[in-house]
Each structure stands twice: as structure tokens, then as C-alpha cells.
Amino acid sequence: MDSESQKKQRILGIDFGSKRIGVAVSDEERKMAFPVSVIQNTPDALNEVEKIAKDNLATQIVLGESRNYKGEGNKILLSSMKFKEQMEAKGFEVIWEAEFMSSIQAERIQGKNDMLDASAAAVILQGYLDRMKED
């Protein structure tokens, strides 16, 4: 894939939770992240995320890597590892991104509301995009 067509592809950001999955998407230039939706974490969630990715021409997914204060994996990490494997089986490149305190950052920015998980996904994705600019 040439760099021009890769630039037009957006990247999806995911804040994976046991009850809800927050979804964000980058702009075409991969500079800014925007909250898109919050999906209930049901058996159909995988298909919903896949549809959002395809609708946004995203082949890459940045998935929040959930760890505790000591940096150890937690219950959510185990579930998100399974989600990662399932999305990779569908042909997506899935990249881990540390998500420590992303929900708290999102709440500070916008307050608590129905899109909080999507905003946390945008915080995760923006962190990844910012690091890619530095490289």
C-alpha cells in the first residue's frame, strides 16, 4: 500500500470495557481523534466494531491496554486480548496502547455523560497518534 492511500485510511481507537466499548476514529491525516460511539459489550459488539471500521476505511485499530496501578494485567485485559485476536482474525491490524487513566482524562475534559467511553477511546487513540508524530 502506498503512503498516499495509507494516509486516507483512518485509525479506530477502542476503550474496551466489560459492559461497554468506546469507539473513536482518527481524521484522514491521522492527526486528531474523535469520539464516535459507545457499543454495549454483547456478543454482537465485534460485528458492530467491524462495521464502524469498514465505514471509516480503517484497517488499523488502537486498543487500550488495561493494566492496574502496578502495571499488571487485570480482568479487562484478558477479555480485550480475546477481542484483539478476533479483530485480527477479521484482517485488522490491532495495536496495543497504554490506557492508564483514560476514562478519568475523558471525564475531566467533558464531564460524565453517555459518550464517556467513546471519549476515553479518543484519549487512547490521540496518545497513539501523538507518539507516531514524534517518530
Listing of model-derived features with the role each one plays in the protein:
Residues 2-12, 18-135:
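Phosphate- and other anionic-substrate recognition elements at nucleic-acid/protein interfaces
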